UniProtKB/Swiss-Prot annotation:
One of its GO terms (cellular component) is cytoplasm. Belongs to the TRAFAC class OBG-HflX-like GTPase superfamily. OBG GTPase family. It is an enzyme of class 3 (hydrolase). It comes from Corynebacterium glutamicum (strain ATCC 13032 / DSM 20300 / JCM 1318 / BCRC 11384 / CCUG 27702 / LMG 3730 / NBRC 12168 / NCIMB 10025 / NRRL B-2784 / 534). The keyword Translocase does not apply. Keywords: Cytoplasm, GTP-binding, Hydrolase, Magnesium, Metal-binding, Nucleotide-binding. GO terms for biological process: ribosome biogenesis. This is GTPase Obg. It comes from the Bacteria. GO terms for molecular function: GTP binding; GTPase activity; magnesium ion binding. Monomer. Transmembrane segments: none annotated. Its EC number is 3.6.5.-.
Length: 501
């Protein structure tokens, strides 16, 4: 059984960037070949693309978790890692993309439009790209950045010109079936239609689309019946058509009270909308009234009697038809086409943009690229935020002392160490950047040259109380029983207390 799904939550994870490579060129008769580690590949993006071949969000309902391909790691001999393959998700026209807060990120209305739903992470630089005059053979590389991971909400709003609204069993499905090639389910019981139906109406050489939404009842805005969720499919319509059942025998119902009840529910739905569809308020949208089931003699007599009263009270054109007998359809078609064409002329032309990218603020000045704030949870601690320092933290291999020293140089050059001094930070203060906390020990002042040191090491770290990678490795071997606990080298005796502590 086909299911119509018009709202889903996607859990997206773009591809992580590949890691850079640490490699030194080795060749006969070339003792100083230099670094030749390649860069990691960019992680794959997750892209939403509009296609006419898809009409529902059903696939995402069953497969909401989506992950793109990771970028390949770099290799020696200057070989860069391959870029992760982009993952393209096909969506139907009229798909609206929202974030977790309900804010609209993109409105995908035209076939071919694309939206980058989650961007892949940048690949890490290899040691060849990190080489400089001061650091000619880096013994480290940068780690690939993680891809974006977040949840997005997709909502489908039908791209119809005409929207049919009415009580259950008013004949909306019958009307769309005789005016177009649509084949909706039709029955003589309430709520036969459980999903929107879309049909194309031909009028001479012109066409327009018509949407039939499930029936409304008084109190739908409070969740009665099928509620108002399906009304999102008439938000884009140029004209609304009230389909009224003139043959109903329900007590307390008549055509005028039916119209008033439906208008009250539409007003309740409009008040709940927090975005502009570009077509104005639903209450200002042109309306028509269709008095259906004129094939029943009593119903036709009632329709003729009330037609003038409805036109005077509401000011809308009124048509008496019979969908079953195909009576009175042509005048209705031509009137709807006239209103739709007029609305199309007034509608602003869409810009031919195939790709939509979320805008991001870019500050090319050094000042303002980071912020230092007191840590509310740690006495005397600080939290540093900013795109660059948080990204650099993710790129750093903290098992490599030289990589940590390189990070310190970058942070100092950005002005963070000077900023911490001005903020009143003391040596040993707890500093948090991008979820990583460490004790602050000033190493470099802004503008100083990098410290020359051996590959994979940094002499500044040896002068501090920081446990080195070699010490951590030996402590791990002791815990696993691979070496004797008292088997320390002469140069490591001083660190024994730190291991045990």
């Amino acid at each position: 059984m086909n299911r119509f799904i018009d709202r889903v939550v996607l859990h997206l994870a773009a591809g992580d960037g590949g890691n850079g490579c640490v490699s030194v060129h080795r060749e006969k008769f070339k003792p100083l070949g230099g670094p030749d580690g390649g860069n990691g590949g960019h992680g794959g993006d997750i892209i939403l693309e509009v296609t006419a071949q898809v009409h529902t969000l059903l696939d995402f309902h069953f497969h909401p978790h989506v992950k793109a391909e990771r970028g390949a790691n770099g290799a020696g001999d200057h070989r860069n890692g391959a870029r992760g393959k982009d993952l393209v998700l096909e969506v139907p026209p009229g798909t609206v993309v929202l974030n977790e807060k309900g804010e609209t990120l993109a409105d995908l209305t035209s076939v071919g439009m694309k939206f980058i739903a989650a961007a892949g992470g940048n690949g890490g630089l290899g040691n060849a790209a990190l080489a400089s005059k001061a650091r000619k053979a880096p013994g480290f590389a940068l780690i690939g950045e993680p891809g974006e991971a977040h949840d997005l909400i997709l909502e489908l709003k039908s791209m119809a010109d005409v929207g049919l609204v009415g009580f259950p069993s008013a004949g909306k499905s019958s009307l769309i079936s005789v005016m177009s090639a649509a084949k909706p389910k039709i029955g003589d019981y309430p709520f036969t239609t459980l999903q929107p139906n879309l049909g194309v109406v031909n009028v001479g050489h012109e066409t327009f689309t018509m949407a039939d939404v499930p029936g409304l009842i008084p109190g739908a805005s409070e969740g009665k019946g099928l509620g108002l969720d399906f009304l999102r499919h008439i938000e884009r319509t140029s004209v609304l058509v009230h389909v009224v059942d003139t043959a109903t025998m329900d007590p307390g119902r008549d055509p005028i009270s039916d119209i008033e009840a439906l208008e009250a529910e539409l007003a309740a739905y409009q008040s709940a909308l927090d975005e502009d569809t570009g077509l104005g308020d639903l209450s200002q949208r042109p309306r028509l009234v269709v008095l259906n089931k004129a094939d029943v003699p009593e119903a036709e007599e009632l329709a003729e009697f009330l037609k003038e009263d409805i036109e005077k009270q509401f000011g809308w054109p009124v048509f008496i038809i019979s969908a079953v007998a195909r009576k009175g359809l042509d005048p209705l078609k031509y009137k709807l086409l006239e209103i739709v064409q007029d609305a199309r002329k007034k509608r602003p032309k869409e810009k031919a943009e195939s790709v939509i990218i979320k805008p991001k603020a870019v500050d090319h000045r050094t000042k303002g690229q980071f912020q230092i704030k007191p840590d509310p949870e740690v006495q005397g601690g600080f939290i540093i935020t900013g795109e660059k320092p948080e990204r650099w933290i993710l790129q750093t291999d903290f098992e490599n002392d030289e990589a940590v020293g390189y990070l310190a140089d970058r942070l100092a050059k950005l002005g963070i160490e000077d900023g911490l001094r001005k903020a009143g930070a003391h040596v040993g203060a707890n500093v948090t950047i991008g979820g990583i906390s460490f004790e602050w020990e000033p190493m470099t002042t802004a503008g100083d040259d990098p410290v020359l040191t051996g590959r994979g090491t940094d002499v500044r770290l040896e002068q501090t109380s920081r446990i080195s990678a070699a010490e951590r490795k030996r402590a791990s071997q002791v815990r696993r029983g691979l070496i004797d606990e008292l088997d320390y080298g002469e140069d490591q005796e001083a660190s024994r207390e730190r291991w045990e502590g």
